[in-house]
């Protein structure tokens, strides 16, 4: 019996995810809808509506004023890729649960940093760059480095290039090409 039998489905999911990334880079039509592509959603963009509510509640518990002051800026993450959007109590319009997760990550980072300045962020395995986009709305970093698989890195570049305020601050490095990252 093949010892890998339990991994075959997971291998196929990974292959389909990378195919979806390549399609989104090669085709503007695929890019316009990549967040709702079933092949992409097996790995990313699959946060459930109720999980989004839990993330929003955590953010409000941490700093409710900052949530409402920045919510429209955070929603910019949802303007590209056609994600699933939902209404949430107390919020105008809709937002994707994945963006709410990135908000939670951002608020947790702000809490841990306790007001410290950050000039450089390095993220390994950054998906399409959503955390980078959301974090950029409340953190004045000089440089953000994303390291990922080559297919994903190309999607990050295409996605983040859509935002002029990030284009020159972000470096997307395929994991097959990186060298030592210097301070």
Enumerate the language-model features and the residues they cover.
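Amphipathic alpha-helical segments that form well-ordered structural scaffolds
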Residues: 104-108, 112, 134, 155-159
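Short, catalytically relevant binding-site loops at active-site mouths
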Residues: 44-45, 128-130, 151-154, 177-180
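Class I SAM-dependent methyltransferase SAM/SAH-binding core
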Residues: 142-167
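Intrinsically disordered, low-structural-confidence terminal and linker regions
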Residues: 1-2
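Conserved Class I S-adenosyl-L-methionine-dependent methyltransferase catalytic core
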Residues: 15-116
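S-adenosyl-L-methionine
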Residues: 158-182
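Conserved class I S-adenosyl-L-methionine
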Residues: 117-127
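Conserved SAM-binding loop of SAM-dependent methyltransferases across substrates and taxa
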Residues: 128-140
């Amino acid at each position: 019996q093949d010892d890998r039998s339990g991994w075959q489905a997971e291998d196929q999911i990974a292959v389909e995810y990378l195919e979806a990334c390549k399609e989104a880079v090669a085709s503007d039509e695929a890019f316009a809808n990549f967040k709702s592509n079933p092949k992409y959603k097996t790995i990313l963009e699959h946060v459930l509506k109720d999980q989004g509510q839990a993330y929003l509640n955590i953010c409000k518990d941490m700093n409710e004023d900052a949530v409402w002051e920045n919510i429209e800026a955070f929603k910019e993450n949802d303007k590209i890729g056609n994600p699933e959007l939902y209404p949430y109590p107390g919020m105008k319009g809709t937002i994707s649960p994945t963006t709410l997760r990135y908000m939670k990550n951002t608020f947790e980072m702000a809490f841990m940093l306790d007001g410290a300045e950050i000039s450089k962020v390095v993220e390994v395995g950054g998906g399409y760059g959503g955390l980078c986009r959301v974090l950029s709305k409340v953190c004045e970093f000089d440089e953000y480095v994303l390291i990922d698989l080559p297919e994903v890195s190309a999607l990050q570049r295409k996605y983040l290039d859509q935002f002029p305020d990030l284009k020159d601050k972000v470096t997307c490095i395929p994991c097959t090409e990186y060298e030592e990252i210097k301070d």
